[in-house]
């Protein structure tokens, strides 16, 4: 089962479950947690397929900065029964420090025992866009690259 908090992640979860189903012939369910419980329509904090006892859950995130959404999401998952959160897939790892000097993603891995992976890191994004032209302008020029480097000198993980 895949789960993602907030509505932005629904397309990510749908795409992931469809690809897993196509590649491996697995029937994967997904759900999303809402910002707040609804008292009408499809009630509850979770939208989609219910989490059931024995489920292994992979959390899908669009971006991880400090790990706050994981701290909010894990209790919701665990409250559903005898479930096993096993992993976190992040579209973009911003590579920022968590509480200490390690990245937020590394802290999540160590704190919650989840396997974590990112599809792409900010370093890869910056490297790819540095001095690249798009519609007649350079996406990340020397000035912007210097500002990004200064930001990561201050807030980046070791």
Q: Language-model features: where?
A:
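Non-catalytic interaction surface on structured domains
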Residues: 34, 41-45, 62-63, 151-155
């Amino acid at each position: 089962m895949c789960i993602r908090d907030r509505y932005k992640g629904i397309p990510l979860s749908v795409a992931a479950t469809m690809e897993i189903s196509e590649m491996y012939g697995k029937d994967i369910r997904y759900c999303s947690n809402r910002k707040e419980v609804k008292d009408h329509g499809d009630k509850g904090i979770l939208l989609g397929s219910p989490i059931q006892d024995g489920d292994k859950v992979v959390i899908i995130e669009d971006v991880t900065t400090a790990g706050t959404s994981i701290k909010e999401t894990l209790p919701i998952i665990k409250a559903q029964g005898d479930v096993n959160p096993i992993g976190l897939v992040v579209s973009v790892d911003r590579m920022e420090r968590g509480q200490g000097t390690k990245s937020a993603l590394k802290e999540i891995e160590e704190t919650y025992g989840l396997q974590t992976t990112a599809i792409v890191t900010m370093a890869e994004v910056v490297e790819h866009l540095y001095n690249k032209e798009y519609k007649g302008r350079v996406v990340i020029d020397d000035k912007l690259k210097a500002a990004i480097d200064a930001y990561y000198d201050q807030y980046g993980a070791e």
